[in-house]
Amino acid sequence: MLSNPEIINALSQLGLTNYESKVYLSLVSEGICTAKDISNICGIPYGKVYEVINSLAAKGFINVLPTKPMKYKAIHPKELIK
């Protein structure tokens, strides 16, 4: 997982929390993941992951894929800049 402090800082300037930044970066680097995958990759408690995912989706940073189990995909960083 990417954990570059400069990237985390840049994402915080865009309004993301530390957990949101970690989840977004993990999805950018890993691709499509389940909540369990995200929890394992980021070290964020599984119960907290859903709160973070919902927040990122509301802010337009990720897409929620209607699969079983639900999967999540980051919006490409270039798309966010537009």
Segments (PLM) and residue ranges:
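A short acidic, leucine-rich amphipathic alpha-helix
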Residues: D37-C42
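Amphipathic alpha-helical scaffolds
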Residues: G43, V49-V52
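Short acidic alpha-helix initiation/capping motifs at coil-to-helix transition points
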Residues: M1-S3
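Alpha-helical DNA-recognition elements
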Residues: E51-K59
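Short alpha-helical "packing" element that flanks the helix-turn-helix/winged-helix DNA-binding module
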Residues: E20-L27
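Key DNA-contact positions within bacterial/archaeal DNA-binding proteins
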Residues: S21, K36, G47
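Short, cationic-aromatic polyanion-contact patches
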Residues: P5, N9-E20, T34, F61-K82
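Short capping segments at the starts of secondary-structure elements
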Residues: V28-T34
